[in-house]
């Protein structure tokens, strides 16, 4: 089975978490709601990749976020690819900034309460990733 290591990062502000809607331009999981995600490159530290992705996807610099929790790694079967798993490294950062500057990977953003997650069509097992952080 092939595994891809990725980070999935959530920003929290006043008990609201940031969700992003993946755009039509990305390779996988188009138009599904997700956290801030990215592939871990080589022997890169997952927390480093998480901070890079926050800046790339929503324009918030490392100095404006604070790590609250690094969740346990979770393996998620890929519905898109046969014999493939995502090895997900979950992160939760606090952030006072409510303004985001989306890049091409996402088309929309929303700050939601955890109990609102079921109202969104998300990437597979996003709820399970979140339970690693709360």
Task: Name the predicted role of every residue range.
Residues 61-71:
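A short coil-to-beta-strand element that immediately follows conserved catalytic motifs
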Residues 90-94, 101-132:
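NUDIX/MutT-family hydrolases
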Residues 29, 36, 96-98, 108:
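Glycine-rich, flexible loop/turn motifs
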Residues 1-18, 39:
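Conserved N-terminal beta-strand and adjoining loop/helix that marks the start
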Residues 4, 13-15, 71-99, 110:
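Active-site-adjacent beta-strand/loop module that shapes the phosphate/pyrophosphate-binding cleft
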Residues 16-57:
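Conserved Nudix-box catalytic region and its N-terminal flanking loop in Nudix hydrolases
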